[in-house]
Every structure is written in structure tokens, then in C-alpha cells.
Amino acid sequence: HAGAVADLAEQLSLPIEGPHRDDEFWIEGMPEAGRRYGFPPLRSFTPDRWLSDGDTVTIGTMTLDVLHCPGHTPGHVVFYHAPSKAAFVGDVLFEGSIGRTDFPRGNHDDLIRSIRSKLFPLGDDITFVPGHGPLSTFGRERQSNPYVSDRVAR
């Protein structure tokens, strides 16, 4: 998901914010991953700012809270906008599913813990935007998601 970051930042003269430093190994490995999977050449990069839990990121007039939610990757971050009750969760949570944890340094237990301890406490009425697929709410997933619903043993 970050293969063009270095080129875009250079072309548009934009700073790179994030990810969390725990994903540095992914960034450093991008050139090799690109070759392995037949992508055009990918460049690694060094962010202008690594993101940590509790940071904020401002885009235009919107300020987003940063939540470090490891599991899918160790440095995965979620962006939360309290005024609009929206969370941009990437590949942590999906409608009826959760993110993969079979990547290097992914961890299923960390992912479940991130969802239950960082995301669900934000409120059942929070709409989330996943990295793929339809929108949902934390409340809906607490009710019916077979991986993290309240009915699943902890």
C-alpha cells in the first residue's frame, strides 16, 4: 500500500507522516518486495515523522487522532476523527472479518487486542472505513463479526 509514497512525496513536495516506527522493516524491504512480485521498481523512504499512539495528523482543516493498532503489521496505525465519528482503519478490521496476520511480524492476538481495546471503546456508533470493502460500524462488528464479536471467547 505504500509502494509509490517516495515518488509521490517527491513529485508533490509533500512530507511523509507515518507509519509507526515498528513498520520500518517493511519500508526498507520495499525494493526487494517489488522485484519479488514483479512490480515496477519501488523505493524505500524515511518518513519526515514517525507516528505514535496519541499523535495527531492534520489534513487541511481536519485533525485526526493516531491510534497504534498492531497485529496486521506491528506498526499499523488507525486514524480517528471524533467530530464525524469516523475511523480509517486500513486492514485491521473489515465488515465481517479482520486483517491478515500471516505477514512477517503480524500477530493474531495483537490484532484482536487492538480491535477490542483501542477501537471498540471509541463507541458502537463509530463508522469505520476499511482498506478494502464496505463501511461498517464498531457496534455492528461487536454484534456479528465472527472474529471479534462480544460472543467470541476472549
What do these predicted ranges mean?
Residues 26, 32-35, 56, 62-68, ...:
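Metallo-beta-lactamase
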Residues 1-58, 143-151:
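Active-site HxH/HxHxD metal-binding segment of metal-dependent hydrolases
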